[in-house]
Amino acid sequence: MAVKIGINGFGRIGRNVFRAALKNDNVEVVAINDLTDANMLAHLLKYDSVHGKLDAEVVVDGSNLVVNGKTIEISAERDPAQLSWGKQGVEIVVESTGFFTKRADAAKHLEAGAKKVIISAPASDEDITIVMGVNEDKYDAANHNVISNASCTTNCLAPFAKVLNDKFGLKRGMMTTVHSYTNDQQILDLPHKDYRRARAAAENIIPTSTGAAKAVSLVLPELKGKLNGGAMRVPTPNVSLVDLVAELDKEVTVEDVNNALKEAAEGDLKGILGYSEEPLVSGDYNGNINSSTIDALSTMVMEGNMVKVISWYDNESGYSNRVVDLAQYIAAKGL
């Protein structure tokens, strides 16, 4: 029986979670809370500038959405504690507004009747942060009720950082994410708390911060203090990459590194980590649902133990599919 999902915040991630859930018989979205009216939500769900038209029938019935004949209840409540998740049968809430990332705030969904909350962002004071393929085995149904799915960039970096550490020992590393612009930037020059994100997103390469590298230690404690990095926001609407330069404990060749990553991609991390030896560009990964896809042609080794690994990720589709995978995993392990 499919686990019942409620989505709070029907933006880029919320809608992509919905799209991913439509293709998964083990999860069912039954309710959405967003301050936008149902007609606009239906329009933005059906037509997407990045991912194309949704292959589903989407209509509005009063204040609700009907997708492929199934009714999804729509509400517009600002206070999560006042939602009707319990009455609607919602078991897991995907908290994707970007506003309720503190545990105390996200836990209001539990007051409203949900059994678990997945925050689709890095969080604070969460019960656990999980990156699928890396540490989902740490989930404890009795004690973990507010769960962070980390960031899209941590979901890209952590799987291959784990492989490098397990195989060769990762002494330290610096990463840069070359990241498509997101809604936390201005489309034209306008005020923002980050002076650089205040500049026109589609006209500039914008250096900014990311907590993704340090956050890896939340799912791989053995790498605490060993990774750091930053971000370059670039004028593309979707698909990003992580460029990791790391010092290993062992001396390796390019072939050693690529073989280890390929083995993981075809084995334990299949469906999470991809591996490509084709000369591809960002647009080729639009719609790719892996968390991370190694660009094997870009792997480099210098002086035996310094390596450079580049991995691509669709920062919308890949991440949203992991949110759905996590919901399915939680339901299987116990609510």
Swiss-Prot record:
Q: Where is this site: Activates thiol group during catalysis?
A: 179
The EC number on file is 1.2.1.12
A GO CC term attached to the entry: cytoplasm
Tell me which positions the record assigns to the signal sequence. Answer: none
What SMART domains does the database record attribute to this sequence?
A: Gp_dh_N
Question: Which GO molecular function, any one, fits this protein according to its record?
Answer: NAD binding
Catalytic site positions: 152 (nucleophile)
Q: In which pathway does it act?
A: Carbohydrate degradation; glycolysis; pyruvate from D-glyceraldehyde 3-phosphate: step 1/5
- Where in the cell? Cytoplasm
Is ATP-binding there in the keyword field?
no
UniProt keywords (A-Z) are:
Cytoplasm, Glycolysis, NAD, Nucleotide-binding, Oxidoreductase
Disulfide connectivity?
none
Residues where NAD(+) binds: 12-13, 34, 78, 120, 183, 315
Name the Gene Ontology biological process terms: glucose metabolic process; glycolytic process
Database matches in Gene3D superfamilies: Dihydrodipicolinate Reductase, domain 2, NAD(P)-binding Rossmann-like Domain
Origin, by domain of life? Bacteria
Question: What is catalyzed by this enzyme?
Answer: D-glyceraldehyde 3-phosphate + phosphate + NAD(+) = (2R)-3-phospho-glyceroyl phosphate + NADH + H(+)
**Residues the entry annotates as binding D-glyceraldehyde 3-phosphate:** 151-153, 182, 197, 210-211, 233
Please describe what this protein does.
Answer: Catalyzes the oxidative phosphorylation of glyceraldehyde 3-phosphate (G3P) to 1,3-bisphosphoglycerate (BPG) using the cofactor NAD. The first reaction step involves the formation of a hemiacetal intermediate between G3P and a cysteine residue, and this hemiacetal intermediate is then oxidized to a thioester, with concomitant reduction of NAD to NADH. The reduced NADH is then exchanged with the second NAD, and the thioester is attacked by a nucleophilic inorganic phosphate to produce BPG.
- What is the protein's quaternary organization? Homotetramer.
Q: Which family does it belong to?
A: Belongs to the glyceraldehyde-3-phosphate dehydrogenase family.
Q: In its UniProt entry, what is this protein called? A: Glyceraldehyde-3-phosphate dehydrogenase
Task: Write the gene name.
Answer: gap
